[in-house]
Amino acid sequence: GLLLLWSLVTQRGIKEIDTRVAVQLINYQDALVLDVRDDSEYAAGHLPNSKHVPSEKIEERWTELEKFKDKPIVVIYQGGVRSNRPSLVLKKNGFSQVFNLMGGIDAWKRASLPIVKR
């Protein structure tokens, strides 16, 4: 199943990016940071100005993101592993620039990048 999921992700054009590329998208292309972790993970620390939509709610709440359809969207999960489903939902609904942060919030913290707590 994992190999199939990987091919789906690459077929649909969802790119994995590292923290350096994510910072460039955020700073220079006004990317939306979409945090799809659960409430407790998000409260423990998240990227500044991120939008929080838990993974299991993405099917019903993706319309909240409609105004970002043509902007880059950087999807954040705990370790980067579970963010494929939300990314696929966004792609399926016409979002053109969806990126998964490789290593998720863990990679962001390892790079000593800014984190805020609720």
Predicted regions and their residues:
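Rhodanese-like catalytic fold shared by cysteine-dependent sulfurtransferases
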Residues: G1-V21, L25-A31, D39-P72, V81-R118
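Active-site flanking residues adjacent to catalytic metal/cofactor-binding acidic residues
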Residues: L34
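Metallo-beta-lactamase
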Residues: I76-Y77
